[in-house]
Protein backbone atom coordinates (compact mmCIF):
# COMPACT_ATOMS: atom_id res chain seq x y z
CA UNK A 1 0.00 0.00 0.00
CA UNK A 2 1.31 3.44 -0.93
CA UNK A 3 2.38 5.77 1.84
CA UNK A 4 0.49 9.09 1.93
CA UNK A 5 1.88 12.41 3.18
CA UNK A 6 0.62 15.97 3.28
CA UNK A 7 2.97 17.44 0.66
CA UNK A 8 4.17 20.85 1.83
CA UNK A 9 5.19 21.89 -1.67
CA UNK A 10 1.85 21.09 -3.33
CA UNK A 11 -0.18 21.70 -0.15
CA UNK A 12 -2.24 18.56 -0.64
CA UNK A 13 -2.34 14.90 0.27
CA UNK A 14 -0.05 12.94 -2.04
CA UNK A 15 1.76 9.63 -2.47
CA UNK A 16 4.87 9.69 -0.30
CA UNK A 17 8.34 8.73 -1.40
CA UNK A 18 9.14 5.01 -1.16
CA UNK A 19 12.32 5.62 0.83
CA UNK A 20 14.53 8.47 2.03
CA UNK A 21 16.31 9.81 -1.06
CA UNK A 22 18.49 12.43 0.63
CA UNK A 23 20.73 11.96 3.68
CA UNK A 24 20.47 13.54 7.11
CA UNK A 25 17.81 15.63 8.80
CA UNK A 26 16.86 17.35 5.54
CA UNK A 27 16.37 13.95 3.94
CA UNK A 28 14.07 12.92 6.79
CA UNK A 29 12.12 16.17 6.41
CA UNK A 30 11.73 15.55 2.67
CA UNK A 31 10.66 11.94 3.24
CA UNK A 32 8.05 12.98 5.82
CA UNK A 33 6.67 16.07 4.04
CA UNK A 34 7.19 15.86 0.27
CA UNK A 35 5.27 13.72 -2.22
CA UNK A 36 6.51 11.89 -5.30
CA UNK A 37 5.03 14.48 -7.68
CA UNK A 38 6.80 17.40 -5.97
CA UNK A 39 10.06 15.43 -5.82
CA UNK A 40 9.80 14.81 -9.58
CA UNK A 41 9.31 18.55 -10.17
CA UNK A 42 12.41 19.24 -8.08
CA UNK A 43 14.48 16.68 -10.02
CA UNK A 44 13.70 18.50 -13.28
CA UNK A 45 14.67 21.86 -11.76
CA UNK A 46 17.80 20.32 -10.23
CA UNK A 47 18.93 18.95 -13.59
CA UNK A 48 18.42 22.35 -15.22
CA UNK A 49 20.37 24.09 -12.45
CA UNK A 50 23.28 21.65 -12.66
CA UNK A 51 23.47 21.96 -16.44
CA UNK A 52 22.91 25.70 -16.83
CA UNK A 53 25.17 26.76 -13.96
CA UNK A 54 27.70 24.01 -14.71
CA UNK A 55 27.62 22.83 -11.11
CA UNK A 56 30.14 20.20 -10.03
CA UNK A 57 28.70 17.83 -7.45
CA UNK A 58 32.22 17.08 -6.21
CA UNK A 59 32.49 20.76 -5.17
CA UNK A 60 31.20 21.45 -1.63
CA UNK A 61 30.06 24.99 -2.49
CA UNK A 62 28.06 23.75 -5.49
CA UNK A 63 26.39 21.07 -3.35
CA UNK A 64 25.52 23.66 -0.68
CA UNK A 65 24.05 25.95 -3.34
CA UNK A 66 21.94 23.12 -4.75
CA UNK A 67 20.74 22.12 -1.26
CA UNK A 68 19.69 25.72 -0.56
CA UNK A 69 17.79 25.84 -3.84
CA UNK A 70 16.12 22.51 -3.03
CA UNK A 71 15.00 23.72 0.41
CA UNK A 72 13.70 26.99 -1.06
CA UNK A 73 11.79 25.14 -3.80
CA UNK A 74 10.30 22.32 -1.74
CA UNK A 75 9.51 24.09 1.54
CA UNK A 76 9.47 27.86 1.01
CA UNK A 77 7.54 28.07 -2.26
CA UNK A 78 10.34 29.84 -4.12
CA UNK A 79 10.75 28.91 -7.76
CA UNK A 80 14.17 28.16 -9.18
CA UNK A 81 15.38 30.96 -11.43
CA UNK A 82 17.52 29.88 -14.34
CA UNK A 83 19.00 32.73 -16.36
CA UNK A 84 18.10 32.65 -20.03
CA UNK A 85 15.53 29.84 -19.71
CA UNK A 86 12.28 30.46 -21.57
CA UNK A 87 9.58 27.85 -20.95
CA UNK A 88 7.97 26.34 -24.05
CA UNK A 89 4.74 27.94 -25.26
CA UNK A 90 1.51 26.32 -24.04
CA UNK A 91 0.26 25.59 -27.58
CA UNK A 92 3.27 23.52 -28.66
Swiss-Prot record:
One of its GO terms (molecular function) is iron ion binding. SUPFAM superfamilies: YggX-like. This is Probable Fe(2+)-trafficking protein. It comes from the Bacteria. PANTHER family: FE(2+)-TRAFFICKING PROTEIN-RELATED. Pfam families: Iron_traffic (PF04362). Could be a mediator in iron transactions between iron acquisition and iron-requiring processes, such as synthesis and/or repair of Fe-S clusters in biosynthetic enzymes. HAMAP family: Fe_traffic_YggX (MF_00686). It comes from Shewanella frigidimarina (strain NCIMB 400).
Amino acid sequence: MARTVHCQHLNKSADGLDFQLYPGELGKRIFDNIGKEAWGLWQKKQTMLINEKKLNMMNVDDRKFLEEQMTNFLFEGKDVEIEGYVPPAEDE
